[in-house]
Amino acid sequence: MRRIRVNDALVLIITFSLLIISSITLSIINNYSGPYKFVYGQPDQKNFNITHSQNIQNIPIKKIHVGDINIAYKVFGKGKPILLISGSGLVMDAWEPSLLKELSSNHTVIIFDNRGVGNTTIGIKPFSIQQSATDTVGFLDALKIQKADVLGFSMASFIAQEITLLHPEKVNRLILYGATCGGEGNIPQAPQVVKILSDLVNNRTQDPEKILSVTFPLEWVKSHPNRTIPESKEIVTSNTLKQQFNLNEAWLAPNWSGVCSQLSKISKPTLVITGTEDVAVPAANSLIIVEKIPGSWLVQIKGGGHGLMYQYPEQFSKIVKAFLETA
């Protein structure tokens, strides 16, 4: 591990050998008969326990009314609250179990389904990053949580940035994973990646190799064909996927300023984490963010894709925990 100073950001360059696991392509892989074998279940219990006796699937779902929706959520662990905001197409049970176990050892962990996802109702208000931020702040208020550590993954990193800029009093420490500040400052996806995502959302492809290539370096999929995939009973409808895809595209579009120019206002301790091989949100976007947020930390995992927390869960979890303990 090397530590170097770049524009007031602490940059940690970490090289790991990676494992592979996917939790966002379950419906495609369920019907897949190709050369890769994806095994469902929990063969290694030590990696999946949230506490000594309780698994995430068995934690009761609670619901609370926020604005025009009922938000489904789970709470576990003890300590200061940390809110995990899920990315596009992900239900709350998609969080890597090792991360949840690590965090719950000294935090009250809160996971939830975004608007229209899983067990959360869709409501009548239009989908947008701003509305998602409003939903999330309203959720914290409904739970009577004054301030929390906030971790946002992918699309949720956009939401987390909005919350921190508009409601800084609600955020203790900020973790942005697979992030970009959007707009004209965004480093765009390659055209072939845009096409794969568009084809997936519009049901024009069910090719698991193409889909996995957006989330993971494909060579790792091929070299780790028997990884266990966390299974969830929750669903994300095609309508919600399209809505989330559209709000992602709106955030990434070059015809607005994004929030890059506003990030210097953030004074919260901030960790930005990415994989060097992330093609869904190119890793260069993370460097832009840490150059804007004073004193922020950047962790780049060599060879990691957008789904790096599934590729190397224990190391990802330790990085997050170390930041929370020292920042």
Predicted segment positions?
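Short glycine-enriched nucleophile-adjacent loop
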Residues: S157-P168, L174
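Catalytic active-site module of serine/aspartate enzymes centered on a nucleophile-bearing elbow/loop
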Residues: S296-A327
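Acidic catalytic loop of the alpha/beta-hydrolase fold
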Residues: E277-V281
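Flexible "cap/lid" loop of the alpha/beta hydrolase fold
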Residues: L165, L174-N203
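Conserved HGGG/HGGXW glycine-rich cap/lid loop of the alpha/beta-hydrolase fold
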Residues: I69-N119
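Conserved alpha/beta-hydrolase catalytic His-Asp/Glu region
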Residues: Q206-S257, S261-Q262
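Short beta-strand/loop motif that positions the catalytic acidic residue
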Residues: I266, V272-T274
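Active-site loop/oxyanion-hole signature of alpha/beta-hydrolase fold enzymes
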Residues: I111, R115-L151
